[in-house]
């Protein structure tokens, strides 16, 4: 309203506050507002349950327990030490344990020479919340998708994506699609070339198998070492938390 005589910052604040109230259902009638409140409450409850299931599945579900040190071939010594400590803390002294977490899985997928073990750990990560047990998240995910759609429609949006993107730089699903269309072809071409290089290396090493998802990190690291003569382990000491903080504030 031009009669308010607001400066740029004040106008921005008013616009954002107004948008917040609209997105919270301020223009809905009492019946629709109650429905929105119920949807938000149920979504909040389901989200907490979903996260708890995922956490339990990660901590209490599958774990890779290794008893013979020869199965640790290729793993850095500090990573093996961490796995030994984890196994001991879980009641398995003298063994090594790996769980489907990023901090445990990615180094294992990168350095382990045991393809069958890489496959087991990778698949356990992908299957979290999808094992038809008390921690299964499939039905929760379906309910959450349905409720998000109901909320978006109630507030005048076609999809949940439209509702979420309105407050981002992208603003709309069409702009997101345009951006993805720009990067899809070159990204896909790059990925195919990397996969071809990895498959070629597999064949050179005498491997009689097709590159799979659990091989990607391992052969990507091998190719990096061959092309650039360095490994992530070599530069890791230079990026410790202490050194990074010193570099940032010195």
Give the residues covered by each predicted segment:
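Alpha-helix N-cap/helix-start motif at coil-to-helix transitions, marked by capping-box chemistry
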Residues: 8-12, 115, 142
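Membrane-interfacial helix termini and the short, flexible loops that connect transmembrane helices
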Residues: 112, 121, 125-135, 163-169
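Active-site-adjacent "gating/activation" loops or surface patches in catalytic cores
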Residues: 89-128, 216, 220
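Aromatic-rich surface patch/π-platform used for binding flat ligands and interfaces
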Residues: 1
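Extended, charged alpha-helical coiled-coil/arm scaffolds that mediate oligomerization and mechanical coupling
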Residues: 4, 10-48, 54
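A conserved hydrophobic secondary-structure block that centers on an alpha-helix together
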Residues: 16, 25-39, 128-161
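Active-site-proximal, well-structured secondary-structure segments within enzyme catalytic domains
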Residues: 9, 13-14, 42-45, 52, ...
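Conserved aromatic-histidine-acidic binding/catalytic patches
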Residues: 9, 24, 28-31, 109, ...
